[in-house]
Regions:
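Acidic, divalent-metal-coordinating active-site segment for phosphoryl/phosphodiester hydrolysis
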Residues: 157-172
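Conserved non-catalytic scaffold segment of RNase H-like nuclease domains
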Residues: 1-122, 134-156
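Motif I (Walker A/P-loop) of helicase-class P-loop NTPases
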Residues: 295-303
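The conserved Walker
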Residues: 292
Length: 303
């Protein structure tokens, strides 16, 4: 990662979410900042604040977030909290759901308020989810939280969004560590085009896994360098037809066939010869010469 030679054993991840008056960082402003710190597989701290944007919060943003003009009028300006936020993020890895928006918007606002440029590495949970949770139908944060059973009481509130994104990150990290090493190796090779330092995060997680190799899950097998789940074929011991005794006599054959077939003496004799040959356990070959019209096909198939 840029600015980080390797992932530390106790690396801190700053999971951030912003609510803003719009999507244009040149004219819109932050109205809510939420951050959850994650370290060693656990949430260790959180910080959230409303922010007075010094401009009107558009009605559609109020409707989406539930954040009103009255609420933010009592909040500090971003200039008042910028340095606190900057120092809170120092020496962390920035994490966000759609990292390009949150990182770039926040970095611009911090510089506007006089902090040094934000240069910490950043990873994107949208792309991590797309890679490691590929069967999900949607990668919107609200949809993922519902599908994965993550508590998300206030969607589009920065503190709630940051909290559920942190929980998503932890879930994805566990998923990564559960994968076969050869699978992680392939993913690391193919992740070069992911956002910011997401690829390096995947690569370094793979490097850590190589140092602590665990046996391959018995449910998988490696074929040509690819870990594949073993196909489980259920074995059924079930008869789908009724067994019956071979109809040796004329009467038995007529009962079996009913009116569908006409009884043929030569065909019946051929059937009995074939049946006796298979049931008597003889090692001799059986040779039968039958005239046209005898019914040879049924004569050897029925027994």
């Amino acid at each position: 990662m840029k600015g980080v030679k390797s992932l530390k054993d106790k690396q801190v991840y700053a999971v951030v979410d912003l609510e803003t008056t719009g999507t244009d960082p040149t004219s819109d402003r932050i109205i809510q900042f939420g951050c959850v710190l994650v370290q060693d597989g656990k949430i260790i701290a959180n910080f959230a604040t409303d922010v007075n944007p010094n401009q009107v919060v558009p009605k559609q943003i109020q409707s989406l977030t539930g954040i009103s003009n009255t609420q933010v009028q009592k909040a500090p300006y971003f200039e008042d909290v910028a340095h606190t936020i900057y120092h809170y993020l120092e020496d962390t890895i920035f994490v966000a759901h759609n990292v390009h928006f949150d990182y770039n918007f926040l970095a611009r606002e911090l510089v506007r308020c006089g902090t040094p440029p934000l240069t910490i590495p950043a990873i994107d949970t949208v792309e991590l989810a797309q890679i490691f949770l590929p069967t999900e139908k949607s990668f919107r944060l609200s949809d993922l939280s519902e599908s994965l059973g993550l508590s998300h009481e206030n969607p589009h509130q920065a503190d709630s969004d940051a909290q559920v994104t942190a929980e998503l990150l932890l879930l994805i990290q566990e998923k990564m560590k559960s994968l076969p090493l050869v699978t992680m190796e392939k993913i690391a090779e193919l992740s070069q085009q992911t956002a910011r330092e997401t690829s390096t995060f995947i690569q370094q997680t793979y490097e850590q896994m190589k140092k602590q190799v665990t046996p391959l899950n018995p449910a998988y097998q490696v074929v040509s360098g690819i870990a594949l789940r073993k196909k489980e074929v259920p074995l059924f011991e079930e008869t789908f037809y009724q067994t019956s005794t071979y109809p040796k006599t004329k009467k038995a054959k007529e009962k079996l066939f009913g009116e569908r077939f006409a009884y043929r003496a030569e065909q019946s004799r051929m059937m009995n010869l074939v049946y006796d040959h298979f049931t008597e356990g003889t090692t001799k070959d059986l040779f039968i010469e039958a005239a046209t019209g005898t019914g040879k096909t049924l004569g050897y198939l029925l027994p």
